[in-house]
Regions:
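Nucleotide donor/acceptor-binding cores
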Residues: 2, 139, 166-169
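Beta-strand-loop-alpha-helix segment that lines the small-molecule cofactor/substrate pocket
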Residues: 89-90, 96-97, 101-148
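N-terminal glycine-/serine-/threonine-rich beta1-alpha1-beta2 phosphate-ribose binding loop
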Residues: 1-110, 314
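Short loop/edge segments at beta-strand edges and connector loops
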Residues: 77, 116, 143, 219-222, ...
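Contiguous beta-strand/loop segments that form the cofactor/metal-binding neighborhood of enzyme cores
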Residues: 205-278, 308-319
């Protein structure tokens, strides 16, 4: 039985991770949650008022208590305390992206398996370093792009494989959402914010899934809005060795869109919520041939649960761990390739 602890009482941990974890309790159970100590939160506390420290501790400990009240387990005062606990086998890490490398590295060095929210880190070198440590210590490292485990992806694959829309001419993947609160970490450069690492990562991963291992980023564009220090929207083109193209668009100051369009020689598939379908959501897609549109409905699924179960597989099986390392490095490489393509086009 794997005992997993959570670093940081975050919203996604309470709303999504814990309900899914409860369904997997025959394989993995909740051990407890750590909230940041003053030193972990502020760094040097010598210039921080006692009132600010007290408010931070009360706020974070109160959040942690909501987990314990609902699910049991133990509260750890400090991320270090959780990571160093002998009662914990694995760590779930839902911190902002810029903090992933530091705390995932520390967890791995302390012999803990790591289940990290996407992106694994903010750069290829850091992801590579985490994989090196995990591999040396025989530990699982899993990045939570849960959408790839949803049954709707295979269902749409099957429609294409049956030839219902003929030969694929183009994939178009779009993921964007309206502007969030100004203090959201996504808009904070120091915390690893930016549309590429957030919405953009989804589109790159799904395009790679559709195009296969020969897919390459050939063009990339990111765009800024004056009042923000991070990129707010962007686009890319990916092509595989067969010449099939995927056009990607993403943003976090956009009208909401989360869809794939697969344009074939005989028809077109469109599906919504392809990257973000929550538990209980009933996926729908359409097949359009000329002016005729056929609606289709698929069963609901729980991709977060499946992502947790994939992590469990990696904990228990070396071959699965190695496969997962390759998945992580591929995603980090695609993000790096995107950045290189953008920089290359802007340096001409």
């Amino acid at each position: 039985m794997i005992k997993i602890g959570i670093i940081c009482p975050s919203e996604i941990a309470f709303r999504r991770f814990m309900p899914a974890l409860r369904k997997a309790e025959k394989d993995i159970v909740f051990a407890g949650i750590g909230y940041a100590s003053p030193e972990e939160w502020f760094g040097d506390t010598s210039k921080v008022s006692l009132e600010a420290i007290r408010e931070q501790q009360e706020r974070e400990s109160s959040k942690a208590k909501t987990f314990i009240d609902a699910y049991g387990g133990k509260i750890y005062r400090g991320y270090h305390a959780l990571i160093e606990s002998e009662d914990v086998d694995a760590i779930y890490l839902p911190l902002p992206p810029a903090l992933h490398f530091k705390w995932a590295k520390m967890a791995l060095e302390n012999g803990k398996h790591v289940f990290v929210e996407k992106p694994s880190t903010t750069c290829l070198a850091d992801t590579d370093e985490l994989i090196r440590i995990a591999s040396e210590k025989g530990l699982a490292l899993h990045e939570n792009y849960m959408f790839v485990f949803h049954d709707q992806l295979k269902a749409i694959d099957d429609v294409v494989a049956r030839g219902e829309i003929g030969d694929v001419r183009l994939y178009r993947i779009s993921f964007g959402f309206p502007r969030r609160a100004q203090n959201d970490f996504r808009y904070n450069k120091a915390l690893g914010g930016g549309a590429l690492l957030d919405a953009g990562g989804y589109t790159l991963k799904y395009a790679d899934y559709l195009l296969g291992e020969t897919a390459k980023v050939v063009t990339a564009q990111i765009n800024y809005i004056p009042e923000f220090e991070v990129e707010m929207y962007g686009s890319a083109t990916m092509v595989n060795d067969e010449g099939v193209t995927a056009q990607l668009a993403f943003g976090m100051d956009n009208d909401y869109k989360c869809e794939v369009e697969i344009w074939g020689s005989l028809g077109t598939i469109k599906a919504n919520r392809i990257l973000t379908a929550p538990e209980g959501f009933v996926p729908r897609y359409t097949i359009k041939k000329n002016q005729d549109v056929e609606p289709h409905e698929l069963p609901a699924d729980d991709s977060f649960l499946k992502s947790i179960l994939r992590f469990v597989e990696c904990v228990g099986n070396e071959n699965e761990r190695i496969t997962n390392y390759k998945v992580l490095i591929r995603q980090a490489t695609l993000v790096s390739d995107f950045r290189n393509a953008y920089e290359s086009s802007n340096n001409k």
